[in-house]
């Protein structure tokens, strides 16, 4: 697909719903890879579903966690995926094989995970009621980032666009800018409302292009800043936001905010309903409101990196928002000018003459001179939309798509070989011996997959009884986690996992698992003893 031909001449934001993506289980979070070709969706049963966004089909399913997936992030080259679940586990996955490379166990719930934009060996983790932690995957070490006050409980953090700095924000409205390599403080400022009142920082998001970033605060205002101005002001600066975005009518609180792929628009999802508000960053005016199904709550929003497409999650389903495709059946003249009606073409006297005797010899300029130039059809130029401003070439090892092979139930070993009768007896004996060797090797236990290394991360002064916000309030933590985890069969009220073998009783379709299994077996034995007839047993 040629992205240059997709350049829209009008508005560059979605206008209407363009279908849904059903992940079978309930979706909680989603994120695009760097090129927008793959969409990773974290589900309620711990699985990660990777969608091929061009075909809108499932390319891979990774059984990642036991508990719900709460945060996802792609590596820069697209080969790795880091995930966090509500049981305080952070894992790194190989996208092609689906294997887990590393696993980290934290003492408190994880609110966000993020790869370093340029170094996929570093991962930023935001634990609940703790300072942010930067993991180094190669040696499994971690560094706790400094905070403004030791009593800071809820601290959010994010890498800037190139990963040179880490921006952190606390519940008192204080923003710290730390150097990524040394964790030194280079700038700081406080977000205030009006005079001196402070407001809590809920999230920090950076644009893919440019130096702008936005801050979502508890006072229901989205503030847009220029990162260069923040660094210029230094410590305890007082920078003014470029824009302040809010819903003045309904005073809507914002669940998730992000920039468009080109950084010219900002989308914010309402925390009250399934509604997306889109603003133009340069002017600050509201250009579009996208309304989903009434009564649904929004969970996550992601904007496509290079196209005007938005993916939002509500009620466990991924909704896609795109532009309205208008078909054009107009007629075009040979010079590609659009015609409103059929026009009879009047040719010039000498237009189709091979040689014009009366024409003088002009100098070749413009299009005539370009006809004599050689056209390079072998070299491939990098696509500007996929390259950063400080890069010249694309990543040749990037993972854009997942290969899919057809599943054959009974493959023939040699469909194009000679028939069995034509094989000599000596070759048949050798084949039989090799077949025995193959069977013996198959009967033996296959080498198990390498178990991922699990590292326990110890954080000082962090309570161990915290419950993730996705699971509800603190208290009955066990029951909450059990309900939110991978579904288990219980009297047919909950869905069964499609990857679990099932045994059904008669036409009622009750899965024989756990305590229900014993109950159904007791009923069966009683009915057999009483001489009852069973119509069907699967």
Swiss-Prot record:
WD repeat copies, ranges: 22-63, 64-103, 148-188, 196-235, 249-291, 293-331
Region (Interaction with WDR5), start-end ranges: 371-380
Biased composition (Basic and acidic residues): 491-510
InterPro entries the UniProt entry points to: RBBP5/Swd1 (IPR037850), WD40/YVTN_repeat-like_dom_sf (IPR015943), WD40_rpt (IPR001680)
Cross-link (Glycyl lysine isopeptide (Lys-Gly) (interchain with G-Cter in SUMO2)): 129
Compartment(s) of residence: Nucleus
GO MF term set: histone binding; transcription cis-regulatory region binding
GO cellular component, one term: nucleoplasm
SUPFAM superfamilies listed in its UniProt record: Nucleoporin domain
Keywords: Chromatin regulator, Isopeptide bond, Nucleus, Phosphoprotein, Repeat, Transcription, Transcription regulation, Ubl conjugation, WD repeat
Region annotation Interaction with ASH2L: where it falls in the sequence: 330-366
Phosphoprotein as UniProt keyword: yes
Domain of life according to the entry: Eukaryota
Modified residues (Phosphothreonine): 252
GO terms under biological process: DNA damage response; response to estrogen; transcription initiation-coupled chromatin remodeling
Basic residues composition-biased segments: 479-490
Modification type Phosphoserine: residues: 350, 388-389, 497, 525
PROSITE patterns according to UniProt: WD_REPEATS_2 (PS50082), WD_REPEATS_REGION (PS50294)
SMART domains reported in the protein's UniProt record: WD40
Pfam families: WD40 (PF00400)
Subunit details: Component of the SET1 complex, at least composed of the catalytic subunit (SETD1A or SETD1B), WDR5, WDR82, RBBP5, ASH2L/ASH2, CXXC1/CFP1, HCFC1 and DPY30. Core component of several methyltransferase-containing complexes including MLL1/MLL, MLL2/3 (also named ASCOM complex) and MLL4/WBP7.
Function: In embryonic stem (ES) cells, plays a crucial role in the differentiation potential, particularly along the neural lineage, regulating gene induction and H3 'Lys-4' methylation at key developmental loci, including that mediated by retinoic acid. Does not affect ES cell self-renewal. Component or associated component of some histone methyltransferase complexes which regulates transcription through recruitment of those complexes to gene promoters. As part of the MLL1/MLL complex, involved in mono-, di- and trimethylation at 'Lys-4' of histone H3.
PANTHER family associated with the record: RETINOBLASTOMA-BINDING PROTEIN 5
UniProt-recorded name of the protein: Retinoblastoma-binding protein 5
């Amino acid at each position: 697909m040629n992205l240059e031909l997709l350049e829209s001449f009008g508005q560059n934001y979605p206008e209407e719903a363009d279908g849904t993506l059903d992940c079978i289980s309930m979706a909680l979070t989603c994120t695009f890879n760097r090129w927008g070709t793959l969409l990773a969706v974290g589900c309620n049963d711990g699985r990660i579903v990777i969608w091929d966004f061009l075909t809108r089909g499932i390319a891979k399913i990774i059984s990642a966690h036991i508990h719900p997936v709460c945060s996802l992030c792609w590596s820069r080259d697209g080969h790795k995926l880091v995930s966090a679940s509500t049981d305080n586990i952070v894992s790194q996955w190989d996208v092609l094989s689906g294997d887990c490379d590393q696993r980290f166990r934290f003492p408190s719930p994880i609110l966000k995970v993020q790869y370093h934009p340029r170094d996929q060996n570093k991962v930023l983790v935001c634990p609940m009621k703790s300072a942010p932690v930067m993991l180094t995957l190669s040696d499994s070490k971690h560094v706790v980032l400094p905070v403004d006050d030791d009593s800071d409980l809820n601290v959010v953090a994010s890498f800037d666009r190139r990963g040179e700095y880490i921006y952190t924000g606390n519940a008192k409205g204080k923003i710290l800018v730390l150097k990524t390599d040394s964790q030194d403080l280079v700038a700081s400022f406080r977000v205030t409302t009006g005079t001196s009142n402070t407001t809590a920082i809920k999230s920090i998001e950076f644009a893919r292009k440019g130096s702008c970033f936005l801050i979502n605060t508890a006072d229901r205002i989205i503030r847009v800043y220029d990162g260069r101005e923040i660094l210029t002001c230094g410590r305890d600066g007082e920078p003014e936001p470029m824009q302040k975005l809010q819903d003045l009518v309904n005073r809507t609180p914002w669940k998730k905010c992000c920039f468009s792929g080109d950084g010219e628009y900002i989308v914010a999802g309402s925390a009250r309903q399934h509604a997306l508000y889109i603003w133009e960053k340069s002017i600050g005016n509201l250009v579009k409101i996208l309304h989903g199904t009434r009564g649904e709550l929004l969970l996550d929003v992601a904007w496509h990196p290079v196209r005007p497409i938005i993916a939002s999650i509500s009620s466990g389903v991924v909704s896609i928002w795109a532009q309205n495709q208008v078909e054009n059946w107009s007629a075009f003249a040979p010079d590609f000018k659009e015609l409103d009606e059929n026009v009879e073409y009047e040719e010039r006297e000498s237009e189709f003459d091979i040689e014009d005797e009366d024409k003088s010899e002009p100098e070749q300029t413009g299009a005539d001179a370009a006809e004599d130039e050689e056209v390079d059809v072998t070299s491939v130029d990098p696509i500007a939309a996929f390259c950063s401003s400080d890069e010249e070439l694309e990543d040749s090892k990037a993972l854009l798509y997942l290969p899919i092979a057809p599943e054959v139930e009974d493959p023939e070993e040699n469909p194009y070989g000679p028939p069995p009768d034509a094989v000599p007896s000596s070759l048949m004996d050798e084949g039989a011996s090799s077949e025995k060797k193959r069977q013996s090797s198959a009967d033996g236990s296959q080498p198990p997959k390498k178990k991922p290394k699990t590292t326990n991360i110890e954080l000082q002064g962090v309570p161990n009884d915290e419950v993730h916000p996705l699971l509800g309030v603190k208290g009955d933590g066990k029951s909450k986690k059990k309900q939110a985890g991978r579904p288990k069969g219980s009297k047919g009220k909950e869905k069964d996992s499609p990857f679990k073998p099932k045994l059904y009783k008669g036409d009622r379709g009750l899965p024989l698992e756990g305590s229900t299994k014993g109950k159904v077996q007791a009923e069966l034995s009683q009915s057999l003893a009483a001489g009852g007839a069973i119509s069907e047993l699967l």
